[in-house]
Structures are given as structure tokens and as C-alpha cells.
A protein has these predicted regions:
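Long, low-complexity, charged/polar intrinsically disordered regions in eukaryotic proteins
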Residues: 1-28
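Long, charge-rich, low-complexity alpha-helical segments
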Residues: 18, 26-116, 176-178, 252-285
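Helix-biased "structured C-terminal domain" signature
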Residues: 57-60, 251-719
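Short amphipathic alpha-helical segments and helix-helix/interface helices
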Residues: 71, 107, 146-154, 534, ...
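Structural motif
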Residues: 93-101, 120-121, 136-141, 164-165
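E1/E1-like adenylate-forming module used to activate ubiquitin-like modifiers
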Residues: 130-233, 242-274
């Protein structure tokens, strides 16, 4: 035996679900594996194994030849690695000038069989002069030594750089000094961009990717260290080697404004009062009203897109304008805190339940630039909606804040029956999870909102405003994205969030009451993009129609629907709302595009099977009502976003409703994010304690009578 220890490389995760076995790479690509390889991978996913351990564990399933053949195949494909069992965890060196000689010293230490004495390395740092550069060599940037050392280095005003020498990669930098920008700023983004990978490293006790570095690797590291030590910017440099070719990437770091290490205790503005200003529009643009063209937004923010050093990791085109018949879709990845920290400290098991540790959003538009800007905005919106821990809150009983607060019962109006059957509802869909019931004797954390209607403070439950906020470990409500939007300015974000509330209020009334609605005469809309989309969808076998869901606010709301002749393929749905009906229709069609890759037969348990069997007439045009044409809608838009907001406030006030906003903007993102709340509007998720969901369709003339809770559509709205 050669005494080697095998391990699953850290950019791979082993997944077993519903009888299928797969490997997931760090970019979330799935690879399914054979039954024979499963035996080995299952063991290596748990922990590293020596050859002796592997052979003993699989001797009844694999022959000696089969075992070594599979190990060699997995090594060649970069899934597993092997290394001598004895090794050190990390190494510290310090020098006035980073030279090849110093890295040769590193090589000598790396070549030792015995583990380097960590205490001795820390002891040596007592002699570090202020101008010396400390290089911390670790197996990988997920190593906890980096975070621990960063705190000490910052307090001691050391200049230092991390270095990782991997099988096929060199990681160097950034160079950290005593000012702003430290490893905590990097680690916050780096770890939350890939929480499952980071979790796997923590579980592995950080041994898996260390190896004896070759002289060639060490000399390359020495050269790279010299370059990065002189770099003017704080940057992480990654060198990848594939065969004889090498590829170099630079990833630039910005300080995290709320870093507890290098930024200290920063005062956090509470966001009230919210002062708005005139914001002239640039004219009609793809996707709605903006103060800046999509291309300009992308140019301004593209350097904030980075998989290691930023809040938004990647923008990946999924549907081009050609594939989307005039519309594009771009998927974006963002740094997620949702369950990530609980995942890392063992509070949850990522293999069980609905652990949302992968932050992925989608954007759409008629142009690729608009789809990219939309995806970037969606990512920043979701990132900013997370609870980080530095946000100001006030803990109080309901009676202590009731005069200025909005009750959770108004914001999430579940019925008594729904609370009594929480588990059954939770199994229906990802969007029908019902929290624990709250009563007024349970104190809550409250955050400040601002009423644009009354120009005064409104206390709002913190758990309603943010993702992943728990009251003493209990969820009395779940944060969601309803009414949250990102924009180039506050006013832009507020209008986008407001239109989202309007479209979902209308969709909830229609869906749960199964109300028949008239269709739009799509032939009457001359926009080339609309007609091209219809024609191309028809060539693909889809019929496309759109229903009018406009309510008493007279803000056009449209749901676009597409269906094939195959009854087992789910309908595709897309919603849109705007002061101008043509924009509402464009938005609905663009959102429908996000489902174009889902035109396959619905699996067992899919919502479509339940809806189809119930004869869903409400999904089709009402033949008794005339088709809607552009002249049937009024245009309430203006040339200034502030005036549009004032009109929205007036529309809500006329119906006895209040428009409230909460500023979620994070300074590191470059966009404004606002949450818009109108207590009393319905959601399109099933909340059957809401009086409006019953009475609203009757007042509109959509239905003849108020339905009972048992008569409402039991299928949750599908997104």
C-alpha cells in the first residue's frame, strides 16, 4: 500500500435525493454518477479515507482492480485528490521582501512529514516589524486560520497576505494593511457566495486540500507574491493551470462598510424620515420607467459582480433574445446569509428540508442589457433584504407600540384553519409555509418604516422586513420579496415595488376566487416585440393569451398565459402591472419567458395536475366579455417618478389604505433597495384570514357572491 489518503475536493459536493446520486460543482452544475462510483464517493463525502479504509469498506461491492480503476478515474476528472496522511494545517512566514529564497524556506517546511508546530509559528510573530510583510500559507481560503489571524494582524497593524497552493491553482492576496479592507471583508463575500462549499471545508477539519507543493508551484507562488505585494489595488489573484496552459484572474476587493474588524462600530441610519425628490424619467425604456438606461447601470455596477469579492457573483445568460422570441433571461448569483450561518454551525442539515443556501435570481427584458440589469437588481434586492445583525431594532410588546405600529395579523393574515393545519399547508408548495401563531403577549423586534401617506413613523415587525430573522429562535412570520425592489434611486425602487404589490393583489383575488376575466386583444397592440413573441411561440406549439386583472385602482394588471396541446405540460404564467398598459403587457410576457425552459411534462405532485383536473376555466378568457383594447385602459403615468409616487399615495388614500416604505439599501451594492407596504392589499400566496380576498372580487363584479374559505382555490399560486 502506498499509504495515500483520498478526499473529495472542496469544489464538489455529494448529493443523494429521491434515489438519485449526483455530484454538484461549486458553480452548481450537477453530474450524475454510476452505482459503483457511488460506493466510494459516499465514503469520501463523509471524511477522508486511506486506501486501507476504502478497500475494507467496499470489498463486498468492488474488486481491488475496480476500486483502484475508479479512484484513478475520479482523480483524472478532478473530483478527488490524494495526499500523504501526515501534514500541517498552516504555515506563517514573514519577510521584509518576498523572495524566492523565502518561498524555498516554505518548501522545506512543507516537505516535512511532521505537522508544523502552530504555537511556534505564532511565537515567531512577536518579532514582526511594522514594515514587514507576513504571508499566511493555508490549504485553501476557506481555512478558519485566515479569519482568526486577520483579527490579530489588524490589531497589531501588520501587513499581510494569504497564500494557498492547490492541486491546480494558486491563490494569492489581497495584501492587507492596517486600514480599511481586511480578510473579514473578503471572507464575508467569499463564504456566502459558496456556503455549501464552505460548510464542507469546516466539516473536513480543513485537511482535505493540503498537499506537498512541487518546486515548480512554489517558485510560481514566489513570483506571484512579489507581484501582488506591489499591487496598488487590493485584489485576489487566482492562477489556474490546465495541462500546460495557465490562466490568471484578478478579483478586486472593496471594504465592507459594516466590517466589524476594519470599519469599527459604524452608526447605522434608521432610514426615517424618507425624503423623496423630483426624478425626471429618461423616457420609455425596456422594462419600465428609469432614471438611467440599462446599459449605463451595467457599466456603473459591472465591477461589483465577482464570485469571490462582491455581493453579486455571476450574471449568466440563460435565454437570449433569439431563444426567448424577443425576450432575454439572465440568472444571477448572490451572497446569501439565509441559513448559511446556521448551516455552518450545525444548527441545520443542508441535506434535509428546504435549506435555501444558494442565492440565485433571474432577470428578464427585451434586450440582453435590460435582462442583465434586471438580474443584477434582483440579486441586490434579495441580498439587501437579508438580516445582517447590525440593523437597528426595538423590542416591545404590541401594546407598547400599537399606536404607531402595523400588526402582524394585518401583514400576514392567515386564518385559524391555516394555523391549525400548518404542516399540511407546508407540503403543498414552497410558498405556502405558515409560521407559528403569534399573540400580543409575545414581544417582537420592530423596525422603523415611514408612512408616505401620513408622513410619520410606522413600526413594522423586523421579521416581516428581512429574510432569516427569528424571534428567540421562533418564526412568527417569514420575510418575503413582496413589494421589495431595487432601483437607481429611491423613487425608482418605490414605484417598482408598488407595482408589484398591485399585480399580486389582483392576482390573489383572481386566482383564489377562480374569477373569469376578459382577454386582451393582442392583435390591437402594434409593438413588434409582442407580435414577434406570439408568432415564435406559435411556431413552438404554444398558444398565448393575456387576461385583464385590472382592479379599482385602474392600474393595468395583466397575466400572460401560454399553453401547448400536450395536457401534461403546465401552463406558463407571467404577471405585469404598470400605469401604462403596454408596459404591463410587456412585463407579463417577459416574465413568462422565465418559464420557457420548463415546457416539459409536469412531475407527479405538480400544481398543474391538481388545477387541470379541476377544470380551470378561470385560466382561459371569459367568452361572455368583450376583448380589451388599448383604449379601454387609462394612462396615469407622468414624466417624473416623484409625481408617480404621489399619485400612488393618492390612489391608496382614496381606498382608505396607507403606503409605507422601509429603506433596505446597503451602501456596498450601488443600488437603492426599498420595501413598499400597503396594509390591506392581498398577497398572491394563500392567506385566507384576509377579508379582502373574499370581498374584493364581489365589489369588482368579478364574482356574484362572497366565497367561504373552503370554496377558495386550495392550490397556492405557483410562484
Amino acid at each position: 500500500m502506498r499509504g495515500e489518503t483520498y478526499y473529495l475536493k472542496k469544489d464538489w459536493s455529494f448529493i443523494e435525493k429521491a434515489g438519485q446520486v449526483a455530484l454538484m460543482k461549486a458553480d452548481y452544475t450537477l453530474f450524475y454518477v454510476s452505482n459503483q462510483a457511488t460506493h466510494l464517493l459516499r465514503l469520501l463525502a463523509e471524511r477522508p479515507h486511506t486506501e486501507e479504509e476504502l478497500l475494507a469498506a467496499v470489498e463486498e461491492k468492488l474488486t481491488l482492480t475496480e476500486c483502484f480503476y475508479l479512484l484513478e478515474q475520479l482523480k483524472q476528472r478532478g473530483v478527488i485528490g490524494c495526499t500523504p496522511a501526515a501534514r500541517h494545517h498552516f504555515l506563517l512566514i514573514h519577510t521584509e521582501e518576498v523572495t524566492a529564497a523565502e518561498v524555498e524556506r516554505l518548501a522545506a517546511l512543507l516537505s516535512e512529514e511532521d505537522e508544523v508546530e502552530v504555537a511556534g509559528q505564532w511565537e515567531a510573530l512577536r518579532e514582526v516589524a511594522p514594515d514587514n510583510l507576513v504571508v499566511l500559507c493555508v490549504p485553501h481560503y476557506h481555512h478558519p486560520a485566515l479569519t482568526a489571524f486577520n483579527r490579530i494582524a489588524h490589531a497589531q497593524h501588520w501587513h499581510w497576505m494569504p497564500l494557498a497552493i492547490g492541486d491546480d491553482e494558486l491563490w494569492v492576496g489581497p495584501r492587507f494593511e492596517s486600514g480599511e479592507g481586511c480578510f473579514e471583508c473578503l471572507g464575508f463575500r467569499f463564504y456566502h457566495q459558496s456556503p455549501v462549499v464552505h460548510y464542507a471545508y469546516l466539516q473536513s477539519d480543513c485537511h482535505l486540500s493540503t498537499h506537498r507543493a512541487s518546486w515548480r508551484q512554489l517558485l510560481a507562488a514566489a513570483e506571484l507574491l512579489r507581484e501582488e505585494a506591489d499591487a496598488k489595488e487590493q485584489r485576489l489573484t487566482l492562477v489556474k493551470r490546465t495541462g500546460e496552459t495557465t490562466e490568471r484572474e484578478h478579483h478586486f476587493l472593496r471594504p465592507w462598510p459594516h466590517c466589524p474588524i476594519c470599519m469599527g462600530e459604524q452608526p447605522v441610519e434608521e432610514g426615517v424620515p424618507v425624503r423623496l425628490q423630483s426624478r425626471p424619467k429618461i423616457g420609455y425604456t425596456d422594462g419600465g420607467d428609469r432614471t438611467e438606461e440599462a446599459q449605463a447601470t451595467i457599466r456603473r455596477l459591472i465591477d461589483r459582480v465577482d464570485p469571490f469579492t462582491s455581493e453579486v457573483g455571476r450574471l449568466t445568460p440563460m435565454v437570449t433574445p433569439e431563444e426567448g422570441y424577443g425576450y432575454s433571461m439572465v440568472v444571477s448569483q448572490w451572497a446569501t446569509l439565509r441559513n448559511a450561518d446556521r448551516l455552518w454551525n450545525g444548527a441545520v442539515d443542508w441535506k434535509k428540508g428546504r435549506i435555501q443556501s444558494l442565492g440565485v435570481s433571474a432577470g428578464k427584458g427585451q434586450s440582453l442589457a435590460q435582462a442583465e440589469a434586471s438580474a443584477l437588481g434582483e440579486s441586490i434586492e434579495r441580498y439587501s433584504s437579508q438580516y445582517f445583525g447590525y440593523e437597528p431594532t426595538h423590542k416591545a410588546l404590541w401594546r407598547e407600540v400599537a399606536n404607531e405600529a402595523i400588526s402582524p395579523r394585518v401583514l400576514i393574515p392567515y386564518s385559524e384553519s391555516q394555523y391549525a393545519h400548518r404542516e399540511e399547508w407546508g407540503k403543498k408548495s414552497d410558498y405556502s409555509h405558515i409560521p407559528e401563531a403569534w399573540n400580543e403577549e409575545i414581544p417582537l423586534h420592530w423596525s422603523k418604516g415611514w408612512s408616505l401617506t401620513h408622513q410619520q413613523l410606522r413600526w413594522l415587525p423586523t421579521a416581516y422586513l428581512f429574510y432569516n430573522f427569528l424571534e428567540e429562535g421562533v418564526a412568527y412570520m417569514y420575510g418575503d420579496s413582496n413589494g421589495v425592489s431595487a432601483g437607481n434611486c429611491r423613487e425608482e425602487a418605490i414605484m417598482q415595488g408598488f407595482f408589484e404589490l398591485i399585480e399580486r393583489d389582483a392576482a390573489g383575488a383572481w386566482w383564489y376566487n377562480q374569477a373569469l376575466r376578459p382577454q386582451l386583444d393582442l392583435d390591437a397592440w402594434p409593438e413588434p416585440s409582442i407580435q414577434r413573441f406570439r408568432r415564435r411561440m406559435g411556431e413552438r406549439g404554444f398558444r398565448v393569451w393575456a387576461l385583464d386583472l385590472t382592479t379599482e385602482f385602474r392600474i393595468p394588471v395583466v397575466i400572460a398565459i401560454a399553453q401547448t396541446d400536450n395536457p401534461n405540460v403546465p401552463m406558463l404564467l407571467g404577471l405585469g402591472a404598470h400605469y401604462r398598459v403596454e408596459v404591463a403587457l410587456q412585463r407579463a410576457l417577459a416574465e413568462l419567458t422565465q418559464s420557457l425552459r420548463e415546457d416539459t411534462e409536469a412531475p407527479e405532485g405538480h400544481w398543474w395536475h391538481t388545477v387541470r383536473q379541476a377544470n380551470p376555466a378561470y385560466l382561459y378568457p371569459d367568452p361572455t366579455q368583450p376583448m380589451r383594447r388599448p383604449t379601454d385602459f387609462i394612462d396615469q403615468s407622468t414624466d417624473d417618478l416623484l409625481t408617480d409616487i404621489e399619485r400612488a399615495v393618492a390612489l391608496m388614500r382614496a381606498e382608505g389604505m396607507e403606503l409605507i416604505v422601509h429603506d433596505l439599501t446597503r451602501p456596498e451594492t450601488g443600488l437603492n433597495v426599498m420595501r413598499v407596504i400597503v396594509p390591506g392589499l392581498s398577497h398572491f400566496w394563500p392567506r385566507f384570514g384576509d377579508p379582502r380576498i373574499y370581498q374584493h372580487p364581489v365589489r369588482l363584479g368579478w364574482t356574484a357572491r362572497v366565497l367561504t374559505e373552503e370554496e377558495l382555490n386550495p392550490v397556492p399560486f405557483p410562484f
